[in-house]
């Protein structure tokens, strides 16, 4: 006589067979084998952003991440996310889906990547929680392409929740260190996607505008033999049997290109600052947008060209990236960025007068501190209703050695900074193009002439008057969007305390 245990097993096996037999949809779902480029199936994947009413009743394939899943009786609702776009998908028991398929879909780990075949259906009521609000996908097949681990280091819904909402409702938000420690997950949020797509737009508009103005894009060395601006804030690297340094800017090389008759040049590339500054706006590595240009008679020719380039960038962002701006504003509310045409220009002495009138004590040759920059930004906004402006004629004492002195006032210089929302985003000037004066200024700053010999020599064979400036990409992105920390606009930020990921 068979044992009770054996009897139970003999009963369970037919039930399993029966269940399997009843699962008429078993070929329509599951975990796919790893894609190793074995084949190229005749299948067209549709972008989630293209799932609109125009595709109603079409059968489509979509590859996306499982953002959320919610089982309800004999059906399961999924939100499928692809970059910053998402769509609701419905898996319901019927001709194409068995109860086992519904259960499988409901238990797919969040952030897993799936291939879904479904029919695009128009919905009677807009789906407010999705970007594709007028349609949903009725799933006929679903296969897991890449399975995410069940425990995520952070929840994406928490990562996009406005801080004010989290505080008021006692709901979770994600702090900065957690975001940066798990940057790959954080970059998947709609806010991060919008920030870095807009940042890409800044680079594109910068390049597009300058090429249209007749500029040539150049690439300059990042490993150099001496501190590029004569300062101590450089990273030292081993260079065979000698020391070399990471460039603080492409400054000296873009000037040498002007001496080589390129006339108008720009570059986009990394710059390095060994400054132990743990502030909201400093990084040890960031992307520099640099410009240098020969002029005819006055450095304002260059200053105005740079200002116009910035205005073209602002216009382009507002015209082409409204969706991204609105996405960021949803989590980080901010007033729209304002600018004037032509750009407001104030002399440094005028800025000092405004600050002194507001109660700030400053000497004529003092540099602006960060709090005073912010205060000046508020004063300028109140008086002129602009977030973007230029300060001209800085004190010579606070500028680099290659800055041209003002011929009318030896304590001033032919230099300027540009500001967004009360924070400096560009520092620029007319450069000294006379080798004798350049040598004198370098010695005044205590710079070893031997280490910048090639730079000074480039001016000995005839050099046109020229000027330029350097812009911090991450700062421009941060300030245009009204964000509060430059680490939000650096994809993988580097600061004195962070070297990974």
From Swiss-Prot:
Residues 411-415 are annotated as: Binding site for the 3'-end of tRNA. One of its GO terms (molecular function) is RNA binding. Pfam families: tRNA-synt_2 (PF00152), tRNA_anti-codon (PF01336). It comes from the Eukaryota. Transmembrane segments: none annotated. It is linked to Hypomyelination with brainstem and spinal cord involvement and leg spasticity: An autosomal recessive leukoencephalopathy characterized by onset in the first year of life of severe spasticity, mainly affecting the lower limbs and resulting in an inability to achieve independent ambulation. Affected individuals show delayed motor development and nystagmus; some may have mild intellectual disability. Brain MRI shows hypomyelination and white matter lesions in the cerebrum, brainstem, cerebellum, and spinal cord. This is Aspartate--tRNA ligase, cytoplasmic. It comes from Homo sapiens (Human). The gene is DARS1.
């Amino acid at each position: 006589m068979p044992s009770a245990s054996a009897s139970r097993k003999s009963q369970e096996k037919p039930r399993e067979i029966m269940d399997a037999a009843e699962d008429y949809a078993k070929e329509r779902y599951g975990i796919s084998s790893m894609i190793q480029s074995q084949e190229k199936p005749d299948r067209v994947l549709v972008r989630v952003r293209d799932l609109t009413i125009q595709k109603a009743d079409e059968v489509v394939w979509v590859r996306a991440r499982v953002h959320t899943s919610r089982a309800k009786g004999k059906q399961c609702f999924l939100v499928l996310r692809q970059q910053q776009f998402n769509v609701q998908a419905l898996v319901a028991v019927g001709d194409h889906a068995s109860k086992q398929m519904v259960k499988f879909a409901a238990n797919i780990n969040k952030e897993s990547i799936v291939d879904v075949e479904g029919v695009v259906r128009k919905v009677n009521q807009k789906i407010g929680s999705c970007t594709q609000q007028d349609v949903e996908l009725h799933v006929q097949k679903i296969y897991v392409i890449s399975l995410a681990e069940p425990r995520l280091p952070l929840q994406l819904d928490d990562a996009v929740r406005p801080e004010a909402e989290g505080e008021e409702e006692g709901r979770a938000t994600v702090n900065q260190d957690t975001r940066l420690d798990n940057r790959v997950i954080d970059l998947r949020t709609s806010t991060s996607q919008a920030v870095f797509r807009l940042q890409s737009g800044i680079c594109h508009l910068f390049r597009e505008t300058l090429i249209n103005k007749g500029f040539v894009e150049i690439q300059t060395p990042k490993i150099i033999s001496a501190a590029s601006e004569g300062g101590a804030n450089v990273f030292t690297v081993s260079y065979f049997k000698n020391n070399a340094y990471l460039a603080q800017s492409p400054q000296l090389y873009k000037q040498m290109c002007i001496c080589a008759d390129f006339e108008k040049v720009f570059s986009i590339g990394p710059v390095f600052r060994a400054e132990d500054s743990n502030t909201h706006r400093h990084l040890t590595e960031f992307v520099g947008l640099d410009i240098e240009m020969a002029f005819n008679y006055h450095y304002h020719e260059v200053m105005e060209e740079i200002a116009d380039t910035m205005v073209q960038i602002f216009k382009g962002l507002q015209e082409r990236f409204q969706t991204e701006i609105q996405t960021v504003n949803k989590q980080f509310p901010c007033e729209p960025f304002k600018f004037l045409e032509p750009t407001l220009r104030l002399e440094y002495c005028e800025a000092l007068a405004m600050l002194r009138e507001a109660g700030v004590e400053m000497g004529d040759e003092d540099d602006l501190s960060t709090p005073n920059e912010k205060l000046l930004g508020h004063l300028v906004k109140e008086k002129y209703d602009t977030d973007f402006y230029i300060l001209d004629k800085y004190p010579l004492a606070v500028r680099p050695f290659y800055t041209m002195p003002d011929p009318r006032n030896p304590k001033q210089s032919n230099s300027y900074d540009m500001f967004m929302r009360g924070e400096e985003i560009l520092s620029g000037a007319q450069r000294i193009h006379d080798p004798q004066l350049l040598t004198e200024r370098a010695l005044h700053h205590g710079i070893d002439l031997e280490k910048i010999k090639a730079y000074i020599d480039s001016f000995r064979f005839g050099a046109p008057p020229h000027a330029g400036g350097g812009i911090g990409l991450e700062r421009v992105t941060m300030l245009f969007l009204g964000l509060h920390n430059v680490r939000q606009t650096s994809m993988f930020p580097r600061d004195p305390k962070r070297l990974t990921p």
